[in-house]
A protein has these predicted regions:
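N-terminal glycine/threonine-rich, aromatic-flanked beta-hairpin/loop signature
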Residues: 44-97, 101-106
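Edge beta-strand at a domain terminus
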Residues: 23, 27, 81-86, 119-138
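Bacterial N-terminal signal peptides that target proteins for export
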Residues: 1-9
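C-terminal motif of bacterial Sec signal peptides marking the signal peptidase cleavage site
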Residues: 17-20
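Short beta-strand segments that buttress and anchor functional surface loops
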Residues: 38-40, 95-101, 120-123
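N-terminal helix-cap/turn-to-beta initiation motif at the start of protein domains
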Residues: 23-39
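A structural signal for short, hydrophobic beta-strand segments that form beta-sheets
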Residues: 88, 109-114
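Ser/Thr- and Asn-enriched, surface-exposed coil loops between beta-strands
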Residues: 92, 114-120
C-alpha cells in the first residue's frame, strides 16, 4: 500500500513538473506592432504594413519596394505588383503577393523571430533571416 502511494505521488510530481515546463511554447506577436514602415538593415529595401478599415471589416495590406533598384513607394500601383495581403498568427507571418497582370497570387510564409516597436526579425523557408528597423513617424 505504501509503495502504491509513493508511486502515485511520484507520477503526480513528474506530471506537475512536465506541465509547468515552457519547452515548446511558441511565441505570440501582436499584429499592431507590425504596422508602419520598416527598412531592411544595410539595404534600401522597405516594407510597409497597413490595416485599413471600412464598413465590412479590416483589411490588412502591405507593400514593398527597393529604392536601390530605382523603385519608390509612389511608383507602386495600389493593390498591384509590390502589394500583398498579410496576416500574423502567433509567430507565422503570411504574405499573399498580388499580381496585377492576372497571374496567380503568390504566398510567402515567414517565421517572426523578434518583433518590438523598433525591430523586426523574420526567417523564410530557406532559412534566410531578414532584419528591419522601424522608420519613426512613418
Amino acid at each position: 500500500m505504501r509503495k502504491s502511494i509513493l508511486r502515485i505521488a511520484l507520477v503526480a510530481m513528474v506530471g506537475a513538473v512536465v506541465a509547468s515546463c515552457s519547452l515548446g511554447t511558441e511565441p505570440t506577436f501582436q499584429e499592431n506592432d507590425l504596422l508602419g514602415l520598416w527598412q531592411e538593415d544595410g539595404k534600401e529595401a522597405f516594407v510597409r504594413f497597413t490595416a485599413e478599415k471600412d464598413s465590412t471589416g479590416v483589411y490588412k495590406y502591405g507593400c514593398e519596394w527597393n529604392e536601390g533598384e530605382g523603385v519608390s513607394e509612389s511608383d507602386l500601383t495600389k493593390y498591384g505588383n509590390g502589394w500583398f495581403k498579410w496576416k500574423l498568427v502567433k509567430a507565422d507571418l503570411t504574405e499573399i503577393h498580388l499580381m496585377e497582370n492576372g497571374g496567380a497570387d503568390i504566398p510567402k510564409v515567414y517565421t517572426v523571430r523578434k518583433l518590438t516597436d523598433t525591430e523586426l526579425l523574420y526567417e523564410d523557408d530557406f532559412k534566410n533571416v531578414h532584419s528591419f528597423q522601424k522608420m519613426a513617424g512613418k
